[in-house]
């Protein structure tokens, strides 16, 4: 029994020494694994290398694995490039829709949208194309470097070079197409802009002609001033000013259906007194005549949308005044700014009440409607003269302010149009 135990110990010691000693003339090499093998958890066994040199099969396997890694990297890069091309193509499609009028709207630009301005669209496309070119050049340089450093067999290098060449040509064709589309978009945008500018210039010229009163009226006084909106910027202005007056008569034709109140048909302001002469109806108040900021209420009713002839007389002596509508005297009074002469050198405005000389209009007091035949005399007209003017028996222009085309300017969208004849206005009463 003791002999058997001794023999077993000796065999165990010999086996341990045999395991510790390396195999003479042998060593191991580590081989790169493909991703599939790593994921499967089945690594290839280490291959013993005899004499310190790789066999042709082992060299080919290592080259194939390195080529596979390179191809995987290039696929990822090409995928990013394709995504960039798809993104740029989508932007071009939206841009074409914008240039063709398919993407009209008033919405704000949001994240990812093309800018509304065609100039910004072209600029953004230029930047995108330049970025794509830079990335393509970087990709080409990287691919060539990888191929030159791979040490692959000549057949593999030729195949890879051909595929890279095809890919490069495809990308260059796509870039050329994008550049052509960008150029076409730029040309269409420029043509559309020129057409728009031409239309706007023609419209501006027409508006200027209307503002200057260049429309062909039958006679210098055969026009009306239209003030269609209650704003603080539509008005007419009489070029001439008033001299110092101790009496006056102001007559005009007007038509308005504004409510509440027709607003201010005319106002005359001088330095230090914005309400030197004002005719106004605002809110639910009756029509008022202001002279030197003193007020008289007039029994006139003209907000029915029909033409009406209005005349107002005033004299500084006792501040006497009269009010006529359609040739009929409807009211009279006194003590309206008595012994106060009308100051000269002021500004006469149609359609707005002035808070300062020539300005600071209030939209709530603006006149809405049409005005014509605004005349001023430096005396009190007789009742029969006013009747004759109202029933079209006579045409008597004012000796201080006559109603003539070249003496009236319009601003802010107010316009001058041919007016109905006096007889047509009478039929409208």
UniProtKB/Swiss-Prot annotation:
Keywords: Calcium, Disulfide bond, Glycoprotein, Lectin, Metal-binding, Secreted, Signal. It is found in: Secreted. Residues 1-14 form the signal peptide. Ca(2+) 1 binds at residues 275, 353-355. Its main location: secreted. GO terms for biological process: associative learning. GO terms for molecular function: carbohydrate binding; metal ion binding. GO terms for cellular component: extracellular region; glutamatergic synapse; presynapse; synapse. Transmembrane segments: none annotated. Binds 2 calcium ions per subunit. Likely to play role in the modification of cellular properties that underlie long-term plasticity. Binds to agar matrix in a calcium-dependent manner. Homooligomer or heterooligomer (probably pentamer) with neuronal pentraxin receptor (NPTXR). PANTHER family: NEURONAL PENTRAXIN-2, PENTRAXIN. This is Neuronal pentraxin-2. It comes from Mus musculus. The lineage of its organism: Eukaryota, Metazoa, Chordata, Craniata, Vertebrata.
């Amino acid at each position: 029994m003791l002999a058997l135990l001794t023999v077993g110990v000796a065999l165990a010691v010999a086996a341990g020494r045999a395991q510790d000693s390396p195999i003479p003339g042998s060593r191991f090499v580590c081989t790169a694994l493909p991703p599939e093998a790593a994921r499967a958890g089945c690594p290839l066994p280490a291959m013993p290398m005899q004499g310190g040199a790789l066999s042709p099969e082992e060299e080919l396997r290592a080259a194939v694995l390195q080529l596979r890694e390179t191809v995987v990297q290039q696929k990822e890069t090409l995928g990013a490039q394709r995504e960039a091309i798809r993104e740029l193509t989508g932007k071009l499609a939206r841009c074409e829709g914008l240039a063709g009028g398919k993407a009209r709207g008033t919405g704000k630009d949001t994240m990812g949208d093309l800018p509304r301005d065609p100039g910004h669209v072209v600029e953004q496309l230029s930047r995108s194309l330049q970025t794509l070119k830079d990335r393509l050049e970087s990709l080409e340089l990287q691919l060539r470097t990888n191929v030159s450093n791979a040490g692959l067999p000549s057949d593999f290098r030729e195949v890879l070079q051909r595929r890279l060449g095809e890919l490069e040509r495809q990308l260059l064709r796509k870039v050329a197409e994008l550049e052509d589309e960008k150029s076409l978009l730029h040309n269409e945008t420029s043509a559309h802009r020129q057409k728009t500018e031409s239309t706007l210039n023609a419209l501006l010229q027409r508006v200027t002609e209307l503002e200057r009163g260049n429309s062909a009226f039958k006679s210098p006084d055969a026009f009306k001033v239209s003030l269609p909106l209650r704003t603080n910027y539509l008005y007419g202005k009489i070029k001439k000013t008033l001299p110092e007056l101790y009496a006056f008569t102001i007559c005009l034709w007007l038509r308005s259906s504004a409510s509440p109140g027709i607003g201010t048909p005319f106002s005359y302001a001088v330095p230090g007194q914005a309400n030197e002469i004002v005719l106004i109806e605002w809110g639910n108040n009756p029509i008022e005549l202001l002279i030197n900021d003193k007020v008289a209420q007039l029994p006139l009713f003209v907000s029915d949308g029909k033409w009406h002839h209005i005349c107002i007389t005033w004299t500084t002596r006792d501040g006497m005044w009269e009010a006529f509508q359609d040739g009929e005297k409807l009211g009279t009074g006194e003590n309206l700014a008595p012994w106060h002469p009308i100051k000269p050198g002021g500004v006469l405005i149609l359609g707005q009440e002035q808070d300062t000389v020539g300005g600071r209009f209030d939209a709530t007091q603006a006149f809405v409607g049409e005005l014509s035949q605004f005349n001023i005399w430096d005396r009190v007209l007789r009742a029969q003269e006013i009747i004759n003017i109202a029933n079209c028996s006579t045409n008597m222009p004012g000796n201080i302010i006559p109603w003539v085309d070249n003496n009236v300017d319009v601003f802010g969208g107010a316009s001058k149009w041919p007016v109905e004849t006096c007889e047509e206005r009478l039929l409208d009463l």
